[in-house]
């Protein structure tokens, strides 16, 4: 049985949650942090994933990749790439399929990985983290992604999960997952015919800003409107601060950090810390030791100066709010509460701008960092066949109208708008077409002029085959089940031909008919399912052979990572054993080894230490094991003698203690008997005592 796993796939950090019988828990990683850096790095032998990638980022700057979700499913020639490339320190390249990849040094070679592979590496890492921490089997996941993700990017996220060995039961909009978290755990929501509670959610994370208007009743949620700014996030504030100090340091210290990626990254990391400090203080010092050219750079920044630096960004705060309200058909006065989530909403000036946009105070009843992950875990639990959860219905919203188009064979029309903009999903529509043979269908966004710039209007294509025309007919009716699934992906779920058959049915008798009346039978024509047709989908998902190849590559790299980790553990165990045994030979083991044994073992330890730092500094796991066992063959004999003597001492001490306890018990019993005897004497009558004397 798989434990439901929810992943809030953040741009800077990701949060992991699992659903269990007692509730939903956040999973801590190997260093007990409640979030994990969304980052992968590459070394001479193995990969560095999550925390280890972050730790080595400064020293491994060109081989460390962050901002993973921003390049997933993105074309190299897309205008967004120019904005994204500013935040990467590794080399980004154009792949054969036109997508973005990164070129790094891995295992001593120049290697290129696709964005899907990079995301799969990280997802595999967090899967292992959840399995280790929960000691549970993890196969199903609900991944929370940005609302602005296209169909192609959602397929890419699902493919990355499959490469990592997971079944993506749902790709959910991150802000919708936060809404689910709100709706599930709120106990005071309206019921029945009561007016729904209207809540605006503001999520400003590391790289983007989303506003969503939702309506809540007990056990249900409906998204009314959503808008976003893809390039408004914490990293933009960090970059503004970094650029400010880049100019200052160029004048003050005659250094240009823009020409040194490592220096620029160090300043940007310090800028992020400064931003957080200024959330609680009006001014703060800023310093970076040995930033470049042996220069220790220092300065300071006030909150007022920061607000001036990001003033152009703050002017964009109201736009997503206005658009989301317009899509919902509401005004700011209709909003009951404004919930803020995401780390960047902690910036005071940003909070003030949001509050002013709605004209009301902000609410922070949700955990700003963990609400999305918990909502995703609950959604995953809904799909679990073994875990019971409280009933909760939620519907998201189509941002753009989607039409289906087909070959024009019999009908006058060759397209139909199936899923209008602002309609809810998941949803299913049935349509019937008259076909003269096999045919193809396409799904496209209806109005190209409504789409964001450079968004491809094509969504998917399907080939429908197996259409058989009855003898004497020129066409056959075909019914198609069109669906926008819970992940927002457009599919044709089923296709089958129809036929008319004549059946006999009894005509119901009137109520006043005699008891012996015989019902009349008439023939009626019914349309029934005839042949199930074959559907071949052409979507953005990876082909099976390509997917299997990438799964195999990921498994190989995972095995290599595991081998390197195990080898390092064996090396550390050997080093620790050498130092520990050497110290104990002159202390607690001294009386349990002959002079010859001590001399021999000390010589072996010295040679083993020399080997460890020379020929054995970088070798295979088996050699560390062999060297350890060679030393342990003698060391364990001496240790055995020591432990035997210690056990003998314990036995003697135990026997002595038992004897002392027995003696104490005997003394106590004797004292008790004496006391009882004295008490008996005191109780004897005086007359009886005299009579006994006579």
From Swiss-Prot:
Subcellular location: Cytoplasm
Disordered: annotated segments: 671-694
Keywords: ATP-binding, Chaperone, Cytoplasm, Nucleotide-binding, Stress response
Cellular-component GO terms for this entry: cytosol; fungal biofilm matrix; nucleus
InterPro entries (UniProt xref): ATPase_NBD, Heat_shock_70_CS, HSP70_C_sf, HSP70_peptide-bd_sf, Hsp_70_fam
One of the GO BP terms on file: proteasomal ubiquitin-independent protein catabolic process
Protein name: Heat shock protein homolog SSE1
Organism, scientific name: Candida glabrata (strain ATCC 2001 / BCRC 20586 / JCM 3761 / NBRC 0622 / NRRL Y-65 / CBS 138) (Yeast)
Gene (UniProt): SSE1
């Amino acid at each position: 049985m798989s434990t439901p796993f929810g992943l809030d796939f953040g741009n800077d950090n990701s949060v992991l949650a699992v659903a269990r019988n007692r509730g939903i828990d956040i999973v801590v990683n190997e260093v007990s942090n409640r979030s994990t850096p969304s980052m992968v790095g590459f070394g001479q032998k193995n990969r560095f994933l999550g925390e280890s990638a972050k730790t080595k980022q400064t020293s491994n700057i060109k081989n460390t990749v962050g901002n993973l979700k921003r390049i997933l499913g993105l074309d190299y020639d897309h205008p967004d790439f120019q904005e994204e490339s500013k935040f990467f320190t590794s080399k980004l390249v154009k792949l054969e399929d036109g997508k973005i990849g990164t070129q790094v040094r891995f295992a001593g070679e120049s290697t290129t990985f696709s964005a899907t592979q990079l995301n799969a590496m990280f997802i595999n890492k967090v899967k292992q983290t959840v399995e280790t921490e929960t000691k549970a089997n993890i196969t199903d996941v609900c991944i929370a992604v940005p609302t602005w993700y296209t169909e192609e990017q959602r397929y890419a996220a699902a493919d990355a999960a499959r490469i990592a060995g997971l079944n993506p039961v749902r790709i959910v909009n991150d802000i919708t997952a936060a809404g689910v978290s709100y709706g599930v755990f709120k106990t005071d929501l309206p019921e029945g015919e009561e007016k729904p509670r209207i809540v605006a959610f503001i999520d400003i994370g590391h790289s983007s800003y989303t506003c969503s208007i939702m309506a809540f009743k007990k056990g249900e949620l409906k998204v009314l409107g959503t808008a976003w700014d893809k390039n408004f996030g914490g990293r933009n504030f960090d970059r503004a601060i970094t650029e400010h100090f880049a100019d200052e340091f160029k004048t003050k210290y005659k250094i240009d950090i823009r020409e040194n990626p490592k220096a620029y990254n160090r300043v940007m990391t310090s800028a992020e810390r400064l931003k957080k400090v200024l959330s609680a203080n009006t001014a703060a010092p800023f310093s970076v030791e040995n930033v470049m050219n042996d220069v220790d750079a220092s300065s300071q920044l006030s909150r007022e100066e920061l607000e001036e630096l990001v003033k152009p960004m703050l002017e964009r705060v109201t736009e997503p709010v206005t658009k989301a309200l317009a899509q919902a058909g509401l005004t700011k006065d209709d909003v009951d509460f404004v919930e803020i989530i995401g780390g960047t909403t902690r910036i005071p000036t940003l909070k003030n701008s949001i509050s002013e946009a709605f004209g009301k105070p902000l609410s922070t009843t949700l955990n700003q960092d963990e609400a999305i992950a918990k909502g995703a875990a609950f959604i995953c639990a809904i799909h679990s066949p073994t875990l019971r959860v409280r009933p909760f219905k939620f519907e998201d919203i189509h941002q753009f109208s989607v039409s289906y188009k087909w070959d024009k064979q019999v009908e006058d029309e060759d397209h139909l708008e199936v899923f209008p903009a602002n309609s809810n999903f998941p949803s299913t529509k049935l349509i019937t077409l008259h076909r003269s043979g096999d045919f193809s269908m396409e799904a496209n966004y209806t109005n190209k002029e409504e789409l964001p710039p450079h968004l491809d209007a094509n969504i998917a294509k399907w080939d429908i085959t197996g259409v058989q025309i009855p003898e004497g007919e020129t066409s056959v009716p075909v019914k198609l089940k069109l669906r926008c699934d819970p992940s927002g992906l457009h599919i044709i779920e089923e296709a089958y031909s129809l036929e008319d058959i004549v059946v006999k049915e009894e005509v119901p008798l009137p109520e006043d008919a005699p008891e012996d009346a015989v019902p009349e039978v008439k023939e009626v024509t019914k349309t029934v399912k005839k042949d199930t047709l074959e559907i071949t989908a052409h979507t953005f998902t990876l082909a099976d052979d390509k997917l299997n190849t990438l799964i195999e590559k990921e498994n190989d790299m995972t095995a290599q990572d595991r081998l390197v980790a195990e080898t390092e553990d064996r090396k550390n165990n050997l080093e620790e054993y050498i130092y520990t045994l050497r110290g104990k030979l002159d202390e607690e083991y001294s009386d349990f080894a002959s002079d010859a044994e001590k001399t021999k073992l000390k010589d072996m330890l010295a040679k083993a230490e020399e080997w460890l730092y020379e020929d054995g500094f970088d070798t295979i796991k088996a050699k560390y094991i062999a060297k350890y066992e060679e030393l342990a063959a003698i060391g364990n004999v001496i240790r055995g003698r020591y432990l035997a003597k210690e056990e003998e001492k314990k036995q003697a001490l135990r026997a002595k203690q038992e004897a002392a306890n027995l003696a104490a018990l005997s003394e106590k019993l004797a004292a008790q008997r004496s006391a009882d005897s004295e008490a008996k004497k005191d109780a004897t009558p005086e007359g009886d005592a005299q009579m006994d004397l006579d």
